[in-house]
UniProtKB/Swiss-Prot annotation:
Disruption phenotype: No visible phenotype, due to redundancy with ESF1.1 and ESF1.3. Simultaneous down-regulation of all 3 genes by RNAi induces embryo abnormalities. This is EMBRYO SURROUNDING FACTOR 1.2. Keywords: Developmental protein, Disulfide bond, Signal. Residues 1-23 form the signal peptide.
């Protein structure tokens, strides 16, 4: 009896998901699959082991800044291209 209930629940959920996909516009689907990755990543610049206290350029880890805003605005840090 439990397995039948589970199968019916999965079946209903699948129809709901299919219904939602059919209502979406093609532009929404194409726009939602793009990943946005910043130019900088949090890094460890001090002695403490678990503390991430600075931001470094993703491509060149030697260029670091105290804040993410400073790192993102650095013209020497190239943006990622896919």
């Amino acid at each position: 009896m439990k397995s039948q209930t589970v199968l019916i629940s999965i079946f209903i959920f699948s129809f709901f998901a299919l219904h939602q996909c059919m209502q979406m516009d093609v532009g929404e689907i194409e726009g939602s699959n793009k990943i946005s990755i910043g130019k900088c990543v949090p890094a460890q610049c001090s002695v403490s082991f678990f503390k991430r206290d600075c931001w470094c350029c993703f491509r060149d880890q030697s260029m670091c800044s105290k804040t993410q805003k400073e790192c993102e605005s650095n013209p020497r840090c190239p943006p990622l291209k896919f």
